[in-house]
UniProtKB/Swiss-Prot annotation:
Core subunit of respiratory chain NADH dehydrogenase (Complex I) which is composed of 45 different subunits. Interacts with TMEM186. Interacts with TMEM242. The keyword Cell inner membrane does not apply. It comes from the Eukaryota. This is NADH-ubiquinone oxidoreductase chain 3. Pfam families: Oxidored_q4 (PF00507). Core subunit of the mitochondrial membrane respiratory chain NADH dehydrogenase (Complex I) which catalyzes electron transfer from NADH through the respiratory chain, using ubiquinone as an electron acceptor. Essential for the catalytic activity of complex I. The gene is MT-ND3. GO terms for molecular function: NADH dehydrogenase (ubiquinone) activity. It is a multi-pass membrane protein. One of its GO terms (biological process) is mitochondrial electron transport, NADH to ubiquinone.
Length: 115
């Protein structure tokens, strides 16, 4: 019986919120609001605009370090295993390789905007 009451309350609240969401919005559509947002670029111009290679390099660097975080997230669970030294060695090697890559990119001036 309690499960039925909880289900009934949840369905009624969800239905109520959906109905309120349909009644509340103000429909003031004007031309600027109807146009899609194009991140500061003119949406009527060509879609094949050239962009700086610096943005690409920063994006690739971000993806690499994001991948590093994704690989290191399971580390607390891996430490609970019996072979802690192998886990820590693997993590240290991964972080060292990424740090050397970052140092190389820094020395090659890949992270600087002005040249």
């Amino acid at each position: 019986m309690n499960m039925f009451i909880v289900l009934l309350v949840n369905i009624s609240l969800a239905s109520c919120l959906i109905l309120i969401a349909f009644w509340l919005p103000q429909l003031n559509i004007y031309t600027e609001k109807a146009n899609p947002y194009e991140c500061g670029f003119d949406p009527m111009s060509s879609a094949r605009l050239p962009f700086s290679m610096k943005f690409f390099l920063v994006a690739i660097t971000f993806l690499l370090f994001d991948l590093e975080i994704a690989l290191l997230l399971p580390l607390p669970w891996a430490i609970q295993m019996s072979n802690i030294k192998a886990t820590m060695l693997t993590s240290f090697i991964l972080v060292s390789v990424l740090a050397m890559g970052l140092a190389y990119e820094w020395l090659q001036k890949g992270l600087e905007w002005t040249e």
